[in-house]
Amino acid sequence: MKVLMFGWEYPPHVYGGLATANFGIAEGLHAQPDMDITLCLPKPWGDEDRTFAKIIGMNCVPIAYRDVNYDYVKDRISHIMEPELYYKFRDHIYADFNYMNVNDLGCMEFAGGYPSNLHEEINNYSIIAGVVARSMDFDIIHAHDWLTFPAGIHAKQVSGKPLCIHVHATDFDRSRGKVNPTVYSIEKNGMDNADCIMCVSELTRQTVINQYHQDPRKCFTVHNAVYPLRQELQDIPRPDHTGKEKVVTFLGRITMQKGPEYFVEAANMVLHRTRNVRFCMAGSGDMMDQ
C-alpha cells in the first residue's frame, strides 16, 4: 500500500508532540509488509531520518513554472529531495499561481514551526498538496492534525482516494473548551470530508463525535505507542533512596490537556500521609498562574 502522508513537523526538528507521533506512526507503518510512505513536510532541513518514509519538502514543490537548469535545481534542493521530483511536480502545476509570493524556483517558502502567519502557511501548504496529489501514485491519504486537514481534503478531491485524518488533539483539548472558531472550522471540515478518523484516545473520540457531530462508525481510537526501554538503560543501577527525600516530577505543558490539576491533587493527598516526598512541576502553559 502506498500512503501519501501530510505532516507539519518531524524529528530532529521537534516543536511539540506532533513530530514524535508522526515519526512513530511512520516507523510502525514501515514495519508492516508492503508499505510505501511518502511524507510531505512544509520545511524539511535535510537531516531528517528517511528510513521509514520518503520526504517531500513542500517548499521545493513548484506552483509557478520556472525554466531552470538541472544543476541549479540540484544545488538548491538536493539536500531535501531528488531534483528529478522538482521537474515531475512542475509538469503537474494545475493553475496560474504567478500572483503568489514564490521564489526563483516557483516555490513558496515556509518559516517552519508555528509562525504568526500560520493560517496563511496552512493555506499555502494545501495549494501545494494539489500539485503533489496530481503527481504521485498512492492508495490512501493520511493527514496529521488540523494543520494538514486542508491539504488532505485537496488531495482527496484531486485523486478520489480515501482520506484518513489523525486527530492528535482537538481545539477543545488545547483551549479548555474556549475554541478558536477558525481552528474549529478547519477541524470540522477535515472530519466531515474524512473517510476515517483516527483519535489518540477514547476521550478524543468522544469529543470528535459529540462536539464535531461525527458518525461514530468512522471514528476509531488508536492509542499512541511507547518504545520499550533499551536494555542498557534498564541495566543502570537505581539509586538507593532509603532515608532520602523522594522527588516526583511533572514535566510538560501546564494546560488542561496534560492534567496538571491531577498532579497537584495527588501531591496534596500524598503529603497528608508522608513528608519525605517533594513534588516538582516544570513547564509553562495557560494554567501556570492557577
Model-derived segments and spans:
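Membrane-proximal helix-turn-helix segments that form the acceptor-binding/catalytic region
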Residues: 130-135, 157, 180-197
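A short, histidine- and acid-enriched strand-loop-helix "catalytic/donor-clamping" loop
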Residues: 138, 150, 165-180, 193-196
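A conserved catalytic-core segment of Leloir-type glycosyltransferases
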Residues: 33-133
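Nucleotide-sugar donor phosphate/pyrophosphate-binding loop at the beta->alpha transition
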Residues: 118-128, 161-164, 172-189, 228, ...
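Conserved donor-binding/catalytic core segment of Leloir-type glycosyltransferases
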Residues: 230, 240-268, 280
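Glycosyltransferase donor-sugar binding loop
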Residues: 251, 278-290
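Carbohydrate-associated surface elements
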Residues: 203, 225
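Short His-centered aromatic/hydrophobic patch
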Residues: 143-148
